[in-house]
């Protein structure tokens, strides 16, 4: 059974919670499909080459068809000519979007959470608010748990908490409404508020 480590106000272990049994039964392929789709959606699509339709010039036949003893040519902009077009090259018109069903997104998140819980890297606390808005106070949370990096999932993310974690290269803070399977997977540890956990683990 996948267990979530519950922490007190001093970020010390104070108990455990169990994820729904169905989480451990999710096919990991759902997580693979979601991450693949997410990364495809992040592609900038800047690679671009010009085909013969877009290369300037080359409209005039460079020499007559017969009689010179050389190979025939109809344009100076074919892909075999220097300064010519590119054959079958990438264009910025390509759409890399990969559809993932809503149910698959949900299953992917469940699988990612189950994997983190199984590894003992999913933590739940009452509150992650950093009222001072200072990075040094936010860093104490990570130092107390001795974590390399962490995804911080906050219920109703406020500006001060965002400012506190924003300067930390090994942390990323996100509102509960924006958490997804990719973010859960890419960080070695996940810290969530209990209220968030009750929402995202609600079955059905």
Swiss-Prot record:
It holds the Pfam family Ribosomal_L4. Residues 53-74 are annotated as: Disordered. The keyword Ribosomal protein applies. It comes from the Bacteria. GO terms for cellular component: ribonucleoprotein complex; ribosome. GO terms for molecular function: rRNA binding; structural constituent of ribosome. The keyword Nucleotide-binding does not apply. One of the primary rRNA binding proteins, this protein initially binds near the 5'-end of the 23S rRNA. It is important during the early stages of 50S assembly. It makes multiple contacts with different domains of the 23S rRNA in the assembled 50S subunit and ribosome. Forms part of the polypeptide exit tunnel. Keywords: Ribonucleoprotein, Ribosomal protein, RNA-binding, rRNA-binding. This is Large ribosomal subunit protein uL4. Belongs to the universal ribosomal protein uL4 family. It comes from Campylobacter curvus (strain 525.92). Part of the 50S ribosomal subunit. InterPro entries: Ribosomal_uL4 (IPR002136), Ribosomal_uL4-like (IPR013005), Ribosomal_uL4_dom_sf (IPR023574). One of its GO terms (biological process) is translation.
């Amino acid at each position: 059974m996948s267990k979530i480590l519950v922490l007190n106000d001093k970020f010390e272990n104070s108990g455990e919670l169990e994820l729904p049994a169905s989480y451990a039964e999710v096919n990991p392929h759902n997580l693979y499909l979601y991450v693949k789709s997410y990364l495809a959606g992040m592609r900038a699509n800047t690679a671009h080459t010009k085909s013969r339709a877009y290369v300037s010039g080359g409209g005039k036949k460079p020499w007559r068809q017969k009689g010179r003893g050389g190979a025939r040519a109809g344009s100076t902009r074919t892909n075999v000519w220097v300064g010519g077009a590119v054959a079958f090259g990438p264009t910025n018109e390509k759409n890399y979007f990969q559809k993932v069903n809503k149910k698959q997104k949900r299953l992917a998140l469940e699988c990612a959470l189950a994997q983190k819980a199984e590894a003992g890297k999913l933590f739940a606390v009452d509150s992650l608010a950093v009222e001072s808005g200072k990075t040094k106070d936010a860093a104490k949370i990570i130092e107390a748990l001795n974590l390399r990096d962490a995804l911080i999932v906050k219920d109703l993310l406020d500006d001060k908490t965002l400012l506190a974690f924003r300067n930390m290269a090994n942390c990323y803070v996100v509102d509960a409404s924006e958490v997804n399977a990719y973010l859960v997977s890419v960080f070695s540890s996940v810290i969530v508020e209990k209220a968030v956990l009750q929402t995202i683990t609600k079955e059905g």
